[in-house]
Amino acid sequence: MKNLLTNPQPSQSDYINAIVKLGSRVYEAATVTPLQKMGKLSDRLHNNIWIKREDRQPVNSFKLRGAYAMISSLSDEQKQSGVIAASAGNHAQGVALSAKQLGLKALIVMPQNTPSIKVDAVRGFGGEVLLHGANFDEAKAKAIELSKSKHMTFIPPFDHPLVIAGQGTLAMEMLQQVADLDYVFVQVGGGGLAAGIAILLKQFMPEIKVIGVESKDSACLNAALEKGEPTDLAHVGLFADGVAVKRIGDETFRLCQKYLDGMVLVDSDEVCAAMKDLFENVRAVAEPSGALGLAGLKKYVKQNNLEGKNMAAILSGANLNFHTLRYVSERCEIGENREALLAVTMPEQPGSFLKFAHVIGNRAVTEFSYRYADNQKACIFVGVRTANEAEKSEIIADLTKNGFDVEDMSDDDIAKTHVRYLMGGRVSNHHERLYSFEFPEQKGALLKFLEILGKRWNISLFHYSAHGADYGNILAAFQLGEKDNAEFEQALAELGYVYEDVTESKAYRYFLR
């Protein structure tokens, strides 16, 4: 264990020895979680699929393992001074409960916009909370500063050998629960869980393939593997906030690069579909990052036409805002190819709708939106229930054959998040530009937006969509003159919100411009 405290790059044998020794200590706080068979999904995918229920830990996530492993290994002098961490999520609760179990002081620095439910959860586990900074980076900088001035030990969320070894205890349990696994799928944020699982499985059962799974919009490990070293992402998506990490850890990268057998990237819709599978199969309500491993498993099976394999994924956590489920319920059908979203152009004349309805036939229409634009043609937004990708292609082919122009919007995020609710008609102002923003869910956010952007330029479209997360999505259009671009870009920089120019979006072009 001493090697893991002092050596930033321990050997595989050092890790294995530490994981084995921690196998008793970690359970002073954590519990052995079940590896549960997913019967319905196994039948559907023609493989035996198990899910590791880390949502059943006392803090409802695997993070307790790594936090307790490191904190319990500190010297008496370090324990007396207490521990400090920066987190707005599961790591914060893991550190707080670990410290409480060991009778230590724990200070958790959280961003000022952290939802009260997360702050209360940390306090409920005995942690002291300091709200500081506008984002995680500022909170982390403050935590490191305080760790030095108060002589407290900083507990990192993933990039420390003891944290990695603590997460590896999960793999020891899996080997005891199902001995003949062929694949294990592990979500990757900072890489601590994947590194800990992979290094142990490759020691005892090297034939098991360990596959890392990342969200497409926060794939920091995949970016590092392509570059050959850890690198900063320009932007990370926040739906699966538990894996929204800008840069993979140095040690976790070293281990993942060496021991992982492959990577799978999934999108938010695929994660939503996996969340639905977890509920339908084992009645578990996972947070988005908690379902990431299962989403990757399903995609990997489809891509590689696998059958008859024994496969496991990790349900890493279940700390989610209840309102997130509204978004999940809307998007899970698309993630399973059970709903097609289409833009269909037809003549603006009597009988066109009837002809369209005959082509669709008895298929279930999930939504239908239309707004008159001109007397030449009409463009409708329609959702149709489908059995699979093949049926969607069949619908598009049938509509095209009958003289309708069809554009598939199923993968257009602007269409799925905003435009489906904005059938208000087109504008004649060709100087309008459309932007999407990640909007912090905090008091004063809208006021700041309007004070910086709403005084100087006319806002001609505005739609807000909440995910039940720390950030929501806003779609806004501005009427800009040709000379406004430089000043507007400067105002966007002053605003400080993550944004993207989506003026060329297909959905905008079809329905709103």
Language model region names:
Residues 1-445, 449-513:
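PLP-dependent amino-acid enzyme catalytic core
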